[in-house]
Amino acid sequence: MRKIVIVEDNEQMLGFMKTTLGGAYEVYTAADGQQGLDEIRRVYPDLIISDLMMPRMDGFEMCTLIRQDPLTSHIPLIMLTAKSNEGDRAASYNCGADAFISKPFSVKTLTTRIEGLIESRIKLQKLYRDRILSSPSEIVIESENDKFILKLIKVIEENLENPDFNIQTLCESIDSSYQYVYRKVKALTGETINDFVRTIKLKRAAQYLCKGELRISEILYKSGFNSHSYFTKCFKEHYGMTPKEYVEQFHDTHGSAQNE
C-alpha cells in the first residue's frame, strides 16, 4: 500500500483527510511543519499533503527543506491553503510543490490529484530506470542522481564474478549506509537494492547471450549467479522467457546462433 504523510494543524481537516484516504493508502499525520518534516524523514512516503499556514514551520519552509534533502527531494507534494491568491500559488510552486489546491475542495479533486502524481512518479521511475540501465557507458551525466546510480552500476559490474560480493560490500564500496543506498535506489528506480543488483546481472547475462560466444552454463556464473535453476527463474521473470528461448528469439531476429 502506498504511503502518504498529511501535515495539517486543523484537527478536523486532518481527521477528515485521514478517514477519506485511509482505505486506499497507509496514512501518517503531523500537526505542523516541523513534525511533518520529522515524520517524512521517518516514513519516506510516496506523497505528501501539506497545509500552507501552520505553527512552528509553515508549508513553504517545510517544502523547501524537503527539496534540499536528496532522500526526500523526489517525493510529490500537494499544498493546501484557505488562501487562493496567485502570490501563494506561485510561491508554492517556487519552493517545489507539485500541486496547489484551495480549500474547500472536493474529495474527487484531492484523490484525482493524488493518483495522478503517484502514477506520474512511477512512470518517471521506469523511464529513469530504462534510460540508466540501457547503456550505462553511453549515459551523459545530467545530475547527482546519475552519478550515484552509475557509480553503483560500476561497482556491481566489477564484482559480478566475486563470490564474496554482497549488498553490504556494495554500500561500503561507495562509502554509504545501507539505509541511504536502499532509499535512494528505491526513490530513483522503484526497485529495492536486491532487485536493482539482480537487474544489472540479468542485463549482463542478456548481453552475453546475444554475443553467442559462451554457453548458458558459463554465462550464468559470469553474470553473478550460482544456480542454474535460480538464474533461469529470474531471467524468465524479467524477460518473460527462458535464456534458451531468448537465444532462439535473438537467432530468429538477427540470424545469429548460440550453443547452450
Regions found by a protein language model. Name each.
Residues 54:
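Receiver (REC) domain active-site loop signature in two-component systems and cognate sites
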Residues 29-47:
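Acidic, metal-coordinating helix/loop segments flanking the phosphotransfer/catalytic sites
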Residues 10-28, 183, 188:
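Two-component/phosphorelay signaling modules centered on CheY-like receiver
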Residues 187-226, 249-260:
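Terminal helix-turn-helix DNA-binding modules in bacterial transcription factors
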Residues 105-114:
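C-terminal output helix
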Residues 167-197, 220-242:
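Basic/polar phosphate-binding segments, predominantly the helix-turn-helix DNA-binding elements
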